Each structure stands twice: as structure tokens, then as C-alpha cells.
A protein has these predicted regions:
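Glycine/Thr-rich phosphate-binding loops of Rossmann-like dinucleotide-binding domains
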Residues: 16, 92-93, 116-117
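Residue-level marker for beta-strand->alpha-helix junctions and adjacent short loops that shape enzyme
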Residues: 13, 43-46, 89, 113-115
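Amphipathic coiled-coil/heptad-repeat helices and related helical stalk/stem segments
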Residues: 23, 66, 91-92
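N-terminal subdomain of nucleotide-sugar transferases
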Residues: 1-44, 75-77, 95-105
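Short N-terminal targeting/anchoring amphipathic segment
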Residues: 8, 72-91, 105-111
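Acceptor-binding helix/loop patch of EC 2.4 sugar-transfer enzymes
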Residues: 49-53, 110-149
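A short, charged, and often flexible helix/loop element on the N-terminal side
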Residues: 42-73, 84-86, 146-149
């Protein structure tokens, strides 16, 4: 019987944290029963790229580098399932756009709420905050919710 092929996607932050530890533990555990292809892109790759600040900001919405690398990966392999841990900030929602056109099911691990809140906790200035929920991150940018930037 052929082992299932799993595409395991993770966007690394600048520092190792719980999400990354979880990603590696799941990769190792799944490796016992499936062929796992880790697809990792680092925030550092984005922030230390030669692109200008406006281009980098645009990559938060659609990262062409990630899209090209992921398309290459999909041309070379066929996957039975996708597991996505996070795409913010380095990968962008283009990962989900590509996943929609694949026959494989997608599982998304929600380690935090960053997809709807830049600081990931729906809390700002001592009170609940849902200003960015729905995908408009402008309030979070104005209030410097992510890394106080």
C-alpha cells in the first residue's frame, strides 16, 4: 500500500516559538505513517529580501515568491492532504488560493487568531478588540498591534 503524501506548510517567525515546535513534532509523528514534505518560508526571508518597503508590505497580502515556490512544489509532487499551520506574515493568503484549486483536503491548525487580528489575541489597550476581524488590518497597523510596529 502506498503511503499518503502530505504537504506540511509553516511560516517561520524570527524566533522559535510554540508553533514551530508543534510543526516539527507533527512532521516527525506523521513521518511514521506518511511521506511528509515540509514547505517552510521564513519571516526573515521576507524582511531581509532586497525588495523595498512597499513591495514587502504588498507581499503580506500576496507573496509572489511563495506562490512561485509552492507552484513548483505542486508541479513536482501530488499530495493527498495539506496541513497549514500559519501563513502570516511571510507567506500570505496565496497559499489558500492555491489550495482551493487542488483536489486534496486542507487542515489548518489555529495556534492563534492572527488571521483576524494582527496581535493574535483580539485584545488591545486592556479591552477586547475586533477591529481587524474580516481581513481589514488597517486598524491593527494604526495601533501598532504586531510587534509594536
Amino acid at each position: 500500500m502506498q503511503r499518503p503524501r502530505i504537504l506540511h506548510i509553516f511560516s517561520r517567525y524570527g524566533e522559535v516559538g510554540g508553533e514551530e515546535i508543534c510543526f516539527h513534532a507533527i512532521t516527525e509523528a506523521l513521518g511514521a505513517i506518511a511521506d511528509v514534505t515540509p514547505f517552510v518560508y521564513s519571516t526573515e526571508e521576507l524582511f531581509h529580501s532586497p525588495h523595498g518597503a512597499l513591495t514587502k508590505m504588498g507581499y503580506l497580502l500576496h507573496n509572489r515568491d511563495v506562490e512561485q515556490k509552492l507552484r513548483k512544489c505542486l508541479r513536482e509532487n501530488r499530495y493527498d492532504a495539506w496541513i497549514i499551520h500559519n501563513t502570516f506574515p511571510a507567506m500570505s493568503p496565496c497559499v489558500y488560493e492555491l489550495a482551493l484549486h487542488q483536489p486534496a483536503p486542507v487542515t489548518h491548525y489555529m495556534h492563534n487568531y492572527r488571521s483576524g487580528c494582527l496581535n493574535g489575541v483580539f485584545y488591545r489597550d486592556g479591552a477586547p478588540c475586533f477591529s481587524c476581524q474580516g481581513g481589514n488590518y488597517f486598524p491593527g497597523i494604526m495601533h501598532a498591534c504586531w510587534r509594536k510596529n
